[in-house]
């Protein structure tokens, strides 16, 4: 599936931005899983729910919202956090509250310049429903180094 997405994305970028896209090292990180890991010679079963592995050298992706960009990070190996970092910005408000608070017009305004759905079915994903990704990244300076900040151009939400 990754290869298919890469191919479609490269074609889309080439058509719209007149430049070839090359993919280097893939970032393979997931955020809801269980793993066996050793800390101080003790084997543990670590559950990461909404968190990514950030062992020394691990590449990770910490997404913001539909309209705020994301970060590529490299883990620092902070054992006090069980080599973990947040998976994303995190919610500022519940999905239900976001649906009650915002309109499709708000969604369109907050995602201007981003190719994405802008209908009532995704209002709960509006950028204002999420914490500020820059503040979240700043709070994790002891967990990850920033490799790159990504600007959102396209957001696929089922």
Which positions does each model-derived feature cover?
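Domain-length cofactor-binding catalytic modules of enzymes
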Residues: 1-158
